[in-house]
Amino acid sequence: MDIHQFDAIRPFEPTELPEVFDRLLQNEQFLQVLAYLYPGVPKEAIGMKMHQCRTNLDFQKAFCYDFLKNLLAKASLGISSDFSRIDLKKRHTFVSNHRDIVLDSALLHFELIDAGSDTTTEIAIGDNLLKLPWVKDIVRLNKSFIVERSLPMRQMLMASKRLSDYMHFVIAEKNDNIWIAQREGRAKNSDDRTQEAILKMMTMGGEGNIAERLKALHIVPLAISYEFDPCDWLKAREMQLRRDVANWKKGPMDDVISMKTGIMAVSYTHLTLPTKRIV
């Protein structure tokens, strides 16, 4: 496969990073986020550190890992996980329950790095979260690939096939891991049953019969549990509005507020992995 057939959904390639860094450093909203996260640090110093990152993984280690380490030290009682029965030299598709937009995959990355993995994961993220251009840049910089949702049925089938092809491409040819939620969106009612549509999508790519296509993705079930959910009131509000207000839709900043709320109030977290790979 040619990676350019996935240009519309893939993360940025290393050669694209300098241009992305420059674009972000000229965005006022992104600069406001930097000022909040790094008070007193000149944007020039941050820009220099960004441009020293040659790969997406470099960026994750230089910024995301250190940020999470400091955040956990200040705002959390800790995080626990056990990768002892997972071969981190092999590549896996972590199919996870979904509680927090940012932290679910970010904390997995944090624990993978601490466990000695030489990579993190590529993250499946819905295009409904990418209404702001700078947010789209950030997530693609952070090794995210895009799940297209707001499409007509015929286009949706084509998009699902491309998404599945890309996931198989990541495992087989890019030699990287994948994180994907087991259902569309966060489970606001704690119902963590895997949606059949997710599994069906995975079988649209690859080769062989259905079982062989799933097996090729090296699926590992992952459960993440937070002691407290700082976004619980936001989730309850959304569920109530969907119930009581006809045709209610989230605004462009609603998910950004959820991202910020979840990050700044992280609690004790536990990642649960199976004793052996299931598929």
Say what each PLM segment does.
Residues 269-275:
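Conserved small/polar residues in nucleotide/adenosyl-binding loops
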Residues 87-91, 140-147, 176-183, 271:
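Glycine-rich, often proline-containing surface loops adjacent to acidic residues and nearby aromatics
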Residues 161-261, 274:
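Membrane-associated lipid acylation/remodeling enzymes share a hydrophobic transmembrane-juxtamembrane segment
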Residues 1-109, 113-120, 136, 140-143:
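Membrane-anchoring hydrophobic helices of lipid-metabolizing enzymes
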